[in-house]
Regions:
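12-transmembrane solute porter fold
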Residues: 30-37, 44, 49-51, 64, ...
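Hydrophobic transmembrane-helix bundles of small-molecule transporters
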Residues: 179-290, 294-297
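Cytosolic juxtamembrane N-terminal segment immediately preceding the first transmembrane helix
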Residues: 1-44, 58
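Structural signature of transmembrane alpha-helices in multi-pass secondary transporters
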Residues: 35, 42, 71-74, 78, ...
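Extracellular/periplasmic helix-loop-helix junction of adjacent transmembrane segments
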Residues: 52-81, 120-123, 313, 318-323
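Central cavity-lining transmembrane alpha-helices of secondary-active solute carriers
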Residues: 72-86, 136-140, 325-338
Length: 350
């Protein structure tokens, strides 16, 4: 089936099966396994090295405040590139973006494991973040292709459970690894998992059933998006590191200027990179705001708590990880119950 599309700045042609309704068993299970593995790796690596930051700072002989960039570099790249890669997935194919993301993430993990200096480790985390951004950007779209429409809620629920568990399981897994191996193994363990995930995804993930022909990727919007979010994180980091106010003010002014240009460019687009049309829906915008606040609070705790337990209370890396294990354990038990209740109780109450 073919459908023509036209916009103020885009012309294209939609070609493919517009009635696609997911995969059949047993392929659906293998495809979801490949999807969950990549997503789990991407999310858990945002927190897995938090417990090891004091050890990394000590071994590389750098201040604790500088070692935070091992975490920040990863998160910064994801924030800058998530929307551009999501847009690219529509044109290039979700499966292709996902596969390239697995490759970049696995190579980044190898470079992290071999790093002997902080700059090299941070640069390697940038490569990891590039891969994670590619994986995360197309994850939900791949889930929609895998599951039939009547089971899509099940797929999205399982996906959310994987994200929730991976978000808080990092310290526990980190403690288990650090109990028997040095910190480079936190990254080396990703390599075999990444290789297996790549071949599983290449074999079982579906290609885009619908392709857009004739519409080009908007590099200008991608650069503006990356610059806006990059300047935002940069200003926050500059403030936390006591950078002179004039530089911070300059960064804020640049962020606002670039951000205004970016936002204005999105209005009137048929395919905006920043979906303001969705944000106009109250329930959607409220849900997004709630999720952002929840994950922000969670990540702040996950980053700060290891330093509190190690530097203030004197726990080692293993003890710190064990104390933080209660968080993911509760999620493991509560998440399935919440998934069962969501069809019976209003989500707002849950």
């Amino acid at each position: 089936m073919t459908k023509h599309i036209n916009g103020n700045d885009e012309v294209g042609q939609v070609v493919g099966d517009l009635d696609w309704n997911g995969l059949h068993r047993p392929r659906i299970y293998y495809a979801m396994a490949a999807t969950f593995c990549g997503l789990f790796l991407s999310v858990i690596d945002g927190t897995i090295c938090n417990v090891a930051l004091p050890a990394i700072a000590s071994q590389l002989d750098v201040p604790s405040s500088d070692s935070i960039w091992v975490v920040n570099a990863f998160q910064l790249v994801i924030m800058m590139l998530l929307l551009p890669f999501s847009s690219l997935g529509e044109l290039w194919g979700y499966k292709q973006v996902y596969l390239q993301g697995i490759v970049a993430f696995t190579l980044g993990s190898l470079f992290c494991a071999l790093s002997g200096t902080l700059p090299m480790l941070v640069l390697s985390r940038v490569v990891q973040g590039l891969g994670a951004a590619m994986i995360m950007s197309v994850n939900t779209s791949i889930v929609k292709l895998i599951y039939p429409r009547h089971r899509l809620g099940e797929g999205v629920g399982l996906n959310a459970t994987v994200v929730a568990i991976a978000s808080v399981a990092g310290p526990s897994l980190s403690a288990a690894i650090l109990a028997v191996a040095p910190w480079p193994w936190l990254f080396a363990i990703n390599i075999p998992v990444g290789i297996v995930t790549f071949f599983m995804a290449r074999k079982y993930l579906p290609d885009n059933p619908v392709r857009v022909i004739g519409r080009k990727f908007n590099w200008r919007d991608a650069v503006l998006n990356a610059a806006t979010f990059g300047l935002f994180i940069g200003c926050v980091e500059a403030y936390s590191h006591d950078v002179p106010p004039r530089y911070i003010i300059g960064g804020v002014v640049a962020m606002v200027a670039v951000g205004c240009i970016y936002v204005r460019s999105q209005f009137g687009r048929r395919y905006p990179m920043l979906p303001f049309d969705l944000l106009k829906i109250p329930i959607f915008s409220t849900s997004v705001a709630t999720s952002i606040l929840s994950f922000t609070a969670q990540m702040l705790g996950m980053v700060a708590m290891p330093f509190l337990l190690v530097n203030t209370f004197g726990y080692d890396a293993v003890g710190t990880g064990l104390l933080m294990t209660s968080w993911p354990l509760v999620i493991v038990f509560v998440a399935p119950i919440a998934g069962w209740l969501i069809s019976k109780v209003h989500p707002g109450i849950l």
